[in-house]
Amino acid sequence: MIIKRVAIMCGGRSSEHEISCISAQGVLGAIDRSKFEPIVIGIRESDGAWFSLDLQSPFGKKSNGLPCVENGAPVDLRTLGVDVVFPLLHGPYGEDGTIQGLCEMMNIPYVGSGVLASAVAMDKSFAKPIFASNGLSVARGMVLTQQEWKSNHKEAMSRATELGFPLFVKPARSGSSRGTTKVKQADELSAAIEDALSHDPKVLIEVAVVGREIECGVLEINGSLHTSVVGEVRVLGNHEFYDFEAKYLDGSTEFDIPAKISESESVLVQAATIKAFQALGCEGLARVDFFLTHDGSLIINEINTMPGFTPKSVFPMLWKAQGKSYTEIISILIESALHRRQHVVR
């Protein structure tokens, strides 16, 4: 067997830098070394510098205790003899088509969706109209740009207020709930918009949906799409929603995998997951997040083309419940990337 060299790419310039590093730690520890030779390429957050990182101790630490890319040997991807890239980059400058485009130009296969699907999935203001046009329900809302906010603050506030409270204000292109605020009344709205605009020049303002937070994964295996079991996220304690702290810092989240929903509801979620995946033209993998309301309505929240990928992240846990180990999922994704390069016209 010819061992394939896999570049695990992590870090990056987004606000999800640390989460990317945690995902890379997980993959590095679990990748099947009888099939693959891993190397780690870290992208420093402050300046976007690329480094080849030590396999034994690749990361430094931030003040919050989470890992980060600090230093390493300067690297040129073209000289490494890489067979496939595993871009474990979450958020802008990685999950949004930028790294995918670079790999396309260099003719290197990579795990996950292509340039267009990655870019559209990252920008909720583009993804949601596509979901709606394909028969998926989305929350009522509006898009607000930085220019609109600066030029006519009063009109923007009026439009948002007309939606009714509570609202969620979030960056159009961000993840891990960074920059997201639940707004209960009008006097909280301006600060929430300013916070979201500090993460992205475009903001999504949506009516808060009351419902259970439901998630489902997709894996592409030999060109065929498969859905995982359906899971539910339950946020405990004082958190208003599934925010960054609840996800990664204070352990106030529990998961029901599989979710305690009816078989017919599970089938509905799995069908909607495939529909969302295909609507955007995704490839390889995704995690699709929904709200299931008390009357049985299913509302799509977002699709993640490179979901959190630690052993304890939702995506691997959904597949573990279906009998696929973390190591097996990693192998499937790498092999699918190589398969697509041979059989899919770009």
Briefly describe each language-model feature range.
Residues D54-P58, G101, F241-L249, T305:
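Short, flexible, mixed-charge acidic loops at enzyme active sites
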Residues I2-C10, S14, I22, T79, ...:
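Active-site nucleotide/adenylate-binding loops and adjacent lid/helix of ATP-dependent enzymes
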Residues I2-K4, M9, K260-R346:
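ATP-dependent carboxylate activation and anion-phosphoryl transfer catalytic cores
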